[in-house]
Amino acid sequence: MILFAGSEERGYFLEEPAKTKKMKVEYLGNAISIETQLTAILEKTMQYLVIDIEQYIDKADELATKIESIKRAKNCNVIIYAPGYVRESRIIQELNFRGIRFYIFAVGQADAKEEFERCLNGYYLQMDDPLEEEDRESAQKDMTGKRIGITGVCRRI
């Protein structure tokens, strides 16, 4: 089973990959703090726990500690749904430090579904550390030439 700690509207991208894997998806609904969902999460038996961290107002270190303790208690794969976040965000750094390796950063539902499928297949476990991998890739890029910045561009245009 896949448990989504968030609303059904935000986690709808889980449905198709779950059907492919013959798994059921359950939604907990929105909450301001992870504390309010903690009991419901601990009561369920799941193989994957997808947590929408955008809904919480908890401090980064407290949230990361709670998620780490849930991971240890339930012995399930925890996937963090953080649309629009970057790997350098404080919460992502805290979670990465605590051993959480699966993230969905995509903003669109189609891209989020693709990243979720990668998480299910263990794609991100093949990397030593996602941050180190990105650093190696950026170091290899040719630094000559001009760079410009563009804002407000959709990926599909």
Residue ranges and their predicted role:
Residues 134-157:
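Walker A/P-loop phosphate-binding motif and the immediately C-terminal alpha-helix
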